Regions:
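Phosphate-group recognition and catalysis centered on beta-loop-alpha active-site segments
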Residues: 13, 21-335
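Gram-negative bacterial Sec-dependent N-terminal signal peptides
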Residues: 1-21
């Protein structure tokens, strides 16, 4: 219903409306539409494509290092099951926290698969001979910083604290470790070119109040059914919720369908979700996720989706696996 209604509406919506405001392009897990996600190679390719920010998701290792992986699990993006079959937990998963950095270095990072071993995006990277490996946050920061220096560029960091409550239960304060790392690179001030993001509202509050982080924070918004954290996202997706978020965060990262009023959509109308105006009024940056050229809603084009995001939704940017089509749209439409 969402995709069919959205298609009909988008076809009748004028997509080219010039605006002076910037539209941030965030490289989701690096150039993950072209190379295995979160590898240094994916970050390098993303840099070459010149987004505004490159994302790093962060999890902890057994020996206290921070590595860049989207999940606390390893089995869907590496060959860990073949190399360490006896390190599986009772739930059938392999966890980064159970491995030292040296052990993680022996793994080959591959294109993402589901838990049955089927590649999630069938037409993405098929190679097996190039050796992609797990990298640390320090390595990602150094790489992007050096490329910025050499090319006189200013691409920012967009770093996510993954599963802080789970890490805490395992005895790891991942947020403090992240802030310690950022401080070493002077990425902890209010003017630093970085967003720290998290799905856990309690941890966002802790970052600001208890840990004293002065930089920009984004609260990611999930659907309650996903079990992403103990946060009640439905309560936050209201005018009052946006006001509460604005007390601690500088921005929000909603799931794309959350941007539209579903009741209006069922009537064939495109109406921004009621909380969206409040978020803008509160000064929250709005960076929804995730635009994928190879996972568009049925029957819709990239131009239609991006047109909705830039006008009439008028969000501040988007997370994307593929930077070039977003840049091309912005160039052609004068955004």
């Amino acid at each position: 219903l969402f995709t069919s209604k959205l298609k009909a509406i988008a076809l009748s919506t004028a997509l080219i409306t010039s605006q002076a405001s910037a539209f941030d392009i965030i490289a989701h897990r690096g150039a993950s539409g072209y190379l295995p996600e979160h590898t240094l190679e994916a970050a390098t390719l993303a840099f070459a494509q010149q987004p505004d920010f490159i994302e790093q998701d962060v999890v902890a290792t057994k020996d206290g290092e921070l590595v860049v992986l989207h999940d606390i699990h390893l089995d869907t993006v590496t060959d860990v099951a073949a190399k360490f079959p006896d390190r599986v937990r009772d739930d059938g998963r392999w966890y980064a926290l159970d491995f030292t950095l040296a052990e993680l270095r022996t793994l080959q990072v591959k294109e993402r698969s589901d838990t049955d071993g089927k590649q999630v995006f069938a037409n993405r990277y098929h190679g097996s001979k190039a050796l992609f490996t797990v990298a640390t946050l320090d390595e990602h920061i150094e790489l992007i910083s050096e490329l910025n220096r050499e090319f006189n560029s200013n691409i920012g960091f967009y770093t996510e604290i993954k599963s802080p409550a789970w890490h805490k239960k395992e005895g790891v304060d991942i947020s403090q470790r992240l802030l310690d790392t950022l401080a070493r690179y002077n990425l902890n001030g209010e003017n630093a070119n970085i967003y720290v993001q998290c799905f856990d509202f309690a941890e966002v509050k802790r970052l600001r109040n208890e840990l004293g982080f002065k930089g920009k924070i984004v609260l990611l918004l999930a659907d309650n059914s996903w079990g992403e954290s103990a946060t009640d996202y439905q309560t936050l997706l209201t005018e009052q919720g946006m006001q509460d978020i604005a007390k601690y965060a500088d921005g929000i990262g909603p799931w794309l369908p959350q941007l539209l009023d579903m009741k209006a959509l069922q009537q064939g109308k495109i109406v921004p979700s009621p909380w969206l105006a409040t978020a803008k009024k509160e000064g929250l940056v709005i960076h929804p996720y995730t635009f994928r050229i190879d996972a568009l809603p049925t029957g819709m084009t990239a131009e239609q989706i991006l047109g909705l995001l830039t006008e009439p939704l008028a969000v501040d940017g988007v997370f994307t696996d593929q930077i070039p089509p977003v840049k091309n749209f912005l160039l052609q439409s004068g955004k």
